[in-house]
A protein has these predicted regions:
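N-terminal cap/lid segment of alpha/beta-hydrolase-fold proteins
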Residues: 1-25
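Short, surface-exposed "cap/lid" segments of acyl-processing enzymes
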Residues: 23-64
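Alpha/beta-hydrolase active-site loop
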Residues: 77-97
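Gly/Ala-rich beta-loop-alpha elbow adjacent to hydrolase catalytic centers
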Residues: 107-115
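Acidic catalytic loop of the alpha/beta-hydrolase fold
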Residues: 157-161, 188
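Catalytic histidine neighborhood in serine/cysteine hydrolases
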Residues: 172-188
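Catalytic histidine-centered segment of alpha/beta-hydrolase-like enzymes
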Residues: 185-197
């Protein structure tokens, strides 16, 4: 498994990025979005790191990047609008680099809102993965309408997004879909970030878009 430091083109300037590459030929390309920038979220957040490593272990090539204004990425916080454009730029980069691979949209917290929303509307993306999605704070309208496979991982004791709200959101989603609840985990999965990786491996090791 190798990790390549990259700078990818963004809508208003370069975006700092890391490309995690598996051993052997990759089977899918994942674009992973980090949590809320104004609350300290970056592509190095523990859950993002653990998720990326888990996905590379099961054969995915994973692009994680810093939204505008984070780290060495150009620009400044844009209340989600510009961050959507950043994610689209990351999708364009991966589609150009890996044109023959399935593309999966994934993100943690605020990043799940960005990734799943863009992924639901982009025909190049065939799978939506959300970790601790803030469904009580953002509209996931496109995701609710989408028939693409959806995978959600959430903490049982999330203090910001109650599990009840996520279960209600999940009930509104079209099949195929799967929800994994991690016992005792809070919103940041403190002390349990590796369990997020374990959950993704269990959900996605044998998954391909063609099988759904």
């Amino acid at each position: 498994m190798s990790e390549t430091v990259r700078e990818i083109p963004g809508a208003i300037g370069p975006l700092e990025a890391l490309l995690d590459v598996p051993h052997g030929e990759p089977r899918a390309a994942v674009i992973f979005a980090h949590p809320l920038p104004i609350k300290g979220g970056t592509m190095h957040t523990k859950v993002v790191f653990q998720a990326a490593k888990a996905l590379t272990r099961i054969g995915c090539v994973v692009l994680r990047f810093n939204f505008r204004g984070v780290g060495r990425s150009a620009g400044s916080w844009d209340n989600g609008r510009g961050e959507m454009d950043d994610y689209r730029a990351a999708v364009d980069f991966m589609a150009g680099r890996y044109p023959d691979l399935e593309m999966w949209a994934a993100g943690f917290s605020f990043g799940s809102y960005i990734a799943m929303t863009v992924g639901a509307d982009d025909d190049r993306m065939c799978t939506l993965v959300g970790i601790a999605p803030p469904v009580n704070r953002y509209e996931y309208t496109s995701v609710k309408l989408s028939t693409k496979p959806k995978f959600i991982v959430h903490g049982e004791s999330d203090e910001l997004i109650p599990l009840k709200a996520v279960r209600e959101f999940y009930a509104q989603l079209h099949e195929p879909k799967e929800l994994v609840e991690i016992d005792r985990a809070n919103h940041l999965f403190d002390g349990q970030a590796s369990e997020v990786g374990d959950a993704l491996e269990e959900l996605l090791t044998d998954f391909t878009c063609e099988t759904r």
